[in-house]
């Protein structure tokens, strides 16, 4: 039954605009929304709070399996971990970098696989991540791979963090994004790549609205 529920996967590197596009497309279609990156970031928060070593794969996998996460249904993008709002904590670069490292552990990815697939509920799902179309929902009828140059993605991230009042360096952000790209591409389990049947979109010169329209057209043209 579950595999008959339509899924649009939106994969791509950090800062490509996946989250903004996926949330907007889900709202337009009236579908459920999965931010898989937020799940890994929530695990990073939980590991820090529970004092679990970032090198202890089995303990991290057990922690991943125990996560109790709730995504806010509204546009505020609130995320609750064990009933505590962690929305502000998961947006830091430190959290993102730790999440990327934890995601390289096969046991962690396996523990979170069923949790992610559980978001596939009627009437449909828009799933945002790195391996949604290749590993988590390989049978999804609609797939997008959203990318942009490292420089453009770093500038977008820089502007986001400055708006939040954070003191950040554009050069440092660019280096971190390039390092995260390399780590995501080269990991042995579920490396970052476009699914063979995905529509590849370079958002470097596109507005947010243009990206949303292209994603919607992928669903509506079928």
From Swiss-Prot:
Belongs to the cytidylate kinase family. Type 1 subfamily. GO terms for biological process: nucleobase-containing small molecule interconversion; pyrimidine nucleotide metabolic process. SUPFAM superfamilies: P-loop containing nucleoside triphosphate hydrolases. This is Cytidylate kinase. The keyword Zinc does not apply. It catalyses: CMP + ATP = CDP + ADP; dCMP + ATP = dCDP + ADP. It comes from Methylococcus capsulatus (strain ATCC 33009 / NCIMB 11132 / Bath). ATP binds at residues 12-20. Keywords: ATP-binding, Cytoplasm, Kinase, Nucleotide-binding, Transferase. It comes from the Bacteria. GO terms for molecular function: ATP binding; CMP kinase activity; dCMP kinase activity. Its EC number is 2.7.4.25. Transmembrane segments: none annotated. It is found in: Cytoplasm. It is an enzyme of class 2 (transferase). The keyword DNA-binding does not apply.
